[in-house]
Design a protein with these regions (language model features):
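Cofactor-binding active-site loop characterized by glycine-rich and histidine/acidic residues
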Residues: 1-102
Length: 102
């Protein structure tokens, strides 16, 4: 990728804390991955960033799962997309609590 895409997959006014680096990182991860992307989010602060239903701040499908289930969920989703011959990106994205604290 030589240029940053203009498309936004995180809408303005998320529920993130002011100056949250995790939401900024996720913004650019999604720009790199593109619109054909599914997020798997374990219980962590990232599930707060997305907002409260029905007012989500994400423009991609999101699956919230338990801490220990994120990798298995993403693996199963990737296999299902592969069997359907789809090249959908499946990304597990977690905040610091979902990554190293638990």
């Amino acid at each position: 990728m030589t240029e940053i895409p203009k498309e936004e997959y995180i809408l303005k006014c998320t529920s993130a804390c002011a100056g949250c680096s995790s939401s900024l990182i996720l913004r650019y991860v999604l720009k790199a991955a593109g619109e054909d992307t599914v997020l798997v989010i374990p219980a962590c602060c990232t599930s707060v960033i997305q907002g409260i239903y029905p007012n989500t701040a994400m423009n991609v499908p999101i699956y919230n799962v338990a801490f220990a289930a994120a990798a298995a969920c993403a693996s199963g989703m990737s296999e299902a997309f592969a069997k359907a011959r789809k090249k959908t990106n499946v990304i597990v994205y977690a905040g610091d609590g979902g990554t190293v604290d638990i």
